[in-house]
């Protein structure tokens, strides 16, 4: 059974880049795309991914709102969430950890670093 990664990202270029990096990594993980936080919540409840990469600033519902919903639900509270964001101030990092993120990953993306982080959370 392949692992599932949910990417919540409103920027099409970032979605395409993450998809490309995952394909090149040969992790064999299925990538599920959500373009905003509400879609991320809905798709997480539907698919129960193994890992969530969550942009913090998106339309409709942002990551700051979506993450507490996911962490407050028994179906998804166990899923590690990586804040995938351009917000890199120390207080932003602290806040993402306080709301339940396992990691805070600041954009711009370094493909090798991102894959290493994903491998860490997909390891059996």
Which stretches of residues belong to each language-model region?
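Conserved acidic carboxylate
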Residues: 9
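Two-component/phosphorelay signaling modules centered on CheY-like receiver
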Residues: 12-32
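Helix N-cap/capping motif at the beta->alpha junctions
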Residues: 13, 33-42, 63-66
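Alpha4 helix (beta4-alpha4-beta5 surface) of REC/receiver domains from two-component response regulators
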Residues: 19, 65, 88-104, 109, ...
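Active-site beta3 strand of CheY-like receiver
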Residues: 47-53
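Receiver (REC) domain active-site loop signature in two-component systems and cognate sites
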Residues: 58
